[in-house]
């Protein structure tokens, strides 16, 4: 899963060139079931991304797959690529794709609509899919006739979910406890009021807590000990947790001028401009949120399940835990809503019958094999894709594989994936870029609000959003046109 610890003020690279015509279907041949014996030798290339810990985890699982009985004739060449360059590398190879590769959810629509991905519906049984998180499976359905995402009549399945990754609030418990003691606060009261894994804080409570914890005696906006309350704030999380969005349901009309959206952006800016508890924009480029958190220069940040692999590998000298993301308590329709990222295991449309069978055997092993899923969560890679495993074995550590490992409240990740209900106000939502033809618009938006001075107080969120709305609407209209 791609790391998203970058500061909210930073802009990413623009989307790459169109994929149309780059890698359409090649000679297909008959369908070979992944369960049938593979008696011919076949080599498949499998590309993934991630930090070194994630790459090592995947090499371990690939080696185990090849060693299993029945896979003797399958050779998997695994290539782990840094997340910052993965999509650039994949685009450069679009005419000669690996047989199996990661596809981030926010690039899925562009690639599937270009014909680069194989429809794998015939290679998976409904009974197999029913074991997985429904929303994870739904993300990789696409109907080429109507150019629509999700399960529908005529839609095909173009990927198996690698994972669902809720990006939730994380705090340095050791640092927080020391700060509570230093300030003479009542620890039991603080935890009961603010730090409950089953009840999210409101924005107002979160701001209050951060101001209590930050040392800024002269109120000059700079902590006396260089320890900020929070490293940065995830824009999508703030927007979702105020019942807002970037556009309407079919991504055809902008919604950045809605008051809920504007209030969400201003909430983030005010953490620095008014409360002085978040790292200011001038310092955001000096150090990313992940590094700042690991270096204990902030109490709160954000993390996903995949970050455990790095934390455990670093053997960090503090205890950490996670919480549901805060929401706007003044909005009766708002709920704690983290963004939930995902990757798909996708097969190249040009893979032949034997390659496809081998690639699907590996994809199914990584996605839904019980032993593989157990190994993944033990390695700190993900919440299990298997719902029964996630909601019992993983949640309660019935196998004893997570004893002594943070976070203690990993139930927050499961709760976020599980979604909301009348009684459950904690949930998650796929990132908005998933719904659009390309994802570059998001980085363009971040660049614009940065250049316009939202984070430095030169302009308000309302001024910036209203000024940018016509340009954003043009981009949405163009992307819809690209889908036909």
List the predicted regions and their residue ranges:
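Conserved N-terminal structural module of periplasmic/extracytoplasmic solute-binding proteins
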Residues: 4-11, 19-116, 128-131, 180-189, ...
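Beta->alpha turn/N-cap motifs
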Residues: 51, 103-107, 232-235, 286, ...
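Extracytoplasmic/periplasmic substrate-recognition and gating elements
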Residues: 72-75, 151-155, 274, 314-388
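Extracytoplasmic ligand-binding clamshell segments of periplasmic binding protein
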Residues: 83-93, 222-227, 232, 241-319, ...
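Short helices/loops that flank or line small-molecule/ion binding pockets
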Residues: 86-97, 114, 175-176, 205-213, ...
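Hinge/lid segment of periplasmic solute-binding proteins
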Residues: 105-168, 204, 321-326, 405-408
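Long, aromatic- and glycine/proline-rich binding clefts that accommodate carbohydrate-like moieties
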Residues: 323-325, 377-454, 458, 478-484
């Amino acid at each position: 899963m791609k790391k998203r610890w970058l500061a909210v003020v930073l802009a990413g690279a623009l989307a790459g060139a169109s994929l149309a015509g780059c890698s359409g279907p090649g000679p297909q041949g008959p369908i070979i079931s992944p369960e049938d014996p593979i008696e011919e030798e076949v080599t498949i290339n499998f590309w993934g991304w991630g930090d070194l810990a994630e790459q090592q985890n995947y090499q371990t699982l690939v080696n185990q797959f090849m060693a299993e009985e029945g896979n003797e004739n399958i050779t998997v060449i695994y290539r782990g690529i840094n997340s910052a360059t993965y999509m650039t590398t994949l685009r450069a190879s679009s005419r000669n794709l690996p047989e199996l590769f990661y596809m981030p959810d926010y690039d899925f629509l562009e690639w599937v609509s270009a014909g680069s991905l194989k429809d794998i519906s015939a290679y998976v049984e409904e009974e197999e899919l029913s074991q997985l998180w429904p929303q994870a499976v739904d993300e990789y359905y696409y109907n080429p006739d109507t150019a629509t995402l999700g399960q529908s009549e005529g839609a095909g399945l173009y990927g198996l979910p690698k994972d669902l990754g809720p990006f939730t609030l994380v705090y340095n418990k050791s640092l927080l406890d020391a700060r509570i003691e230093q300030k003479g606060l009542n620890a039991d009261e603080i935890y009961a009021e603010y730090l409950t894994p089953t009840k999210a804080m409101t924005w107002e409570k979160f701001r209050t807590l951060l101001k209590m914890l930050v040392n800024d005696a002269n109120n000059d906006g700079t902590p006396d000990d260089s320890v900020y309350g929070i490293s940065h704030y995830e824009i999508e999380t703030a927007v979702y947790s105020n019942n807002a969005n970037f556009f309407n349901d079919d991504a055809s009309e902008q919604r950045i001028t809605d008051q809920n959206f504007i209030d969400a952006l201003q909430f983030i800016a005010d953490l620095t401009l008014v409360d002085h508890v978040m790292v200011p924009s001038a310092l955001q480029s000096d150090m990313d949120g992940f590094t700042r958190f690991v270096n204990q220069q902030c109490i709160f940040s954000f993390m996903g399940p995949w970050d455990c692999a790095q934390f455990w590998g670093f053997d960090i000298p503090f205890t950490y835990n996670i919480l549901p993301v805060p929401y706007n308590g003044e909005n009766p329709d708002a709920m704690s809503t983290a963004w939930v990222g995902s990757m798909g295991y996708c097969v190249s449309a040009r893979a032949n019958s034997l390659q496809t069978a081998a690639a699907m055997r590996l994809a199914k092993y990584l996605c839904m094999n019980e032993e593989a899923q157990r190994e993944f969560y033990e390695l700190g890679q993900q919440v299990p894709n298997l719902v029964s495993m996630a909601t019992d074995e993983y949640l309660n550590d019935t196998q004893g594989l997570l004893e002594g490992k943070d976070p203690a409240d990993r139930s927050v990740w499961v709760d976020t994936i599980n979604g909301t209900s009348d009684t459950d106000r904690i949930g998650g939502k796929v990132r908005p870029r998933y719904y659009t033809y390309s994802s570059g618009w998001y980085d363009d938006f971040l660049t614009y609000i940065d250049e316009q001075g939202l984070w430095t107080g030169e302009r308000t969120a309302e001024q910036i959003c209203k000024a940018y709305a016509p340009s954003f609407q043009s981009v949405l209209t163009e992307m819809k046109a690209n889908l036909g």
